[in-house]
Amino acid sequence: MELITQKIRQCIEKVKDMSQVGFDRDYVIKDNKPDVSKVVCQNGQVKLDEIKASGENIWLSGSIEFEVLYTREEVFEGDEPEENIGGNRVEHIKDAIPFQEKLVLQGVCEKDTVRVYTGLDELTVGVINSRKLSVRGIISVELYGEREENLEVAQRIDDKDVEQLMGQMKVLKLDSAVRDIVRIKNVVTLPKTKPNICKLISSLVDMRNLEYTYERDHITLTGECHACIVYLSEEQEICCFEVQEGVSNEIRCEGDNAGNIAWLRTQPAMHQVEAENDYDGELRQLSIEAALAVDGKVWSEETVEVLNDMYSVSCPVKPVFENMKVCSLLMKNDTKCRILEQLYRENSKKRILRICGTKTQAAIAQIKNADTGIIVSGVLQVNCVNIVEDDGCPIEMHTDSVPFEQFVEIPGMDANTCCEVNVQVDQVQVNLLDNSEYEIKGVVSINAIALQQDEVSVITSVEQEKTSSDTEEEAALVGYIVQKDDKMWDIAKRYRTTVENIMEINALTSDSVKTDDRLIIARM
């Protein structure tokens, strides 16, 4: 009696957690840089190099990559003109501070896979003394513990003497786990209205309006690479240049069904901006390189035939059931959240003359369950580079955090629903209303996927059942009154006959019965 089964590859989420990690480091300014007087601008990102899991202990190793613009304490005699920047005394530091952090993710074991996503929620660079800076911030960490396993589903028994109750089950089959680095490179030329580049001072690079589509054997990732470049001209003036270039990349993955379901998460891995000569030999081109760490999955939604129950009228056998988790898709929902906020800089003594560019990121603060979905609360962080009214240092950066809240509809959620949410910036526009008041308009994309992980009883094997003496003495013909919740299959199995036999004896045209129906049953 052979049990015919089908193996279905699944990824079961076991546990998830969101936490924040604070860091506080001292940074000693290198000898080739002059003394610091005041920090003007700062920005940074988290670079995750290694994830080590040992049971419930998760070790994260990486670095905080940061950029700082600061004013010199004084202008040194003998400096080259380009180092004095026309008396503006602006200097640039770009470096990284390594970190290692231990987190605990309860419920995972050695065989599980741990996914980690990080973001830099806050960065503050202060002056300790003329040769030392304090770098402080908060890193947000998303942790997911999951396990790949094969669900073995019994589909039939290769024996004509066995009665089989068939059914259908919707499952989400894992076709491919995607993990890759997407590299982006653009070369842009300065507008004719902009002067030539003498020296790059700072660069803010981020990705916006990222979208992906699954097309049989690959995922197409499209979006916009946004860069704000601050440079020194040949006339020793500080200039700003903002550019936005479209990008498109293909990520290879398994699967050949155009209707497959894809889920993708991206994280910035690096960026680099270099000045290059154009065809005329002038320094008017910018090479912008960026890399995104891509992590995701591709599923196919299938309806499979399953063997729900079985028995034999000729020999005493019984199925052995085991509870297993079955993953299915509840909903995938993409929502846009529009943001409009007016802000006023009360404590600033410098008048804003022009907003040069921005760097943005969106982060989740909290996810709450609602009646028919979830409420996602988060923060849109906008770093603005401004030209201000200050002959000594005409450039500054300020960071604004604009809260947002959006309801995402996911009907049918319960305790067995696993929901993952990703937020990213689509558009941001900062308009200067007057010299101290400005307006932030933005669109944040909120992507949510909800998977149902229900525990289902499935047949894993068939074993021989002992024959009792009472069975041999039972009457060959019995009368039966249908009880509440009785089904024809259960009645036939109890009296070791077949559904077809009961229907034939009682002249029934359907196998449906209702309470208090009277049946004649002939044992086989």
Residue ranges of predicted features:
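Interfacial loop/beta elements and low-complexity acidic/Ser/Thr-rich segments
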Residues: 1-473
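Primarily a LysM-type cell-wall glycan-binding module
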Residues: 467-504, 509-524
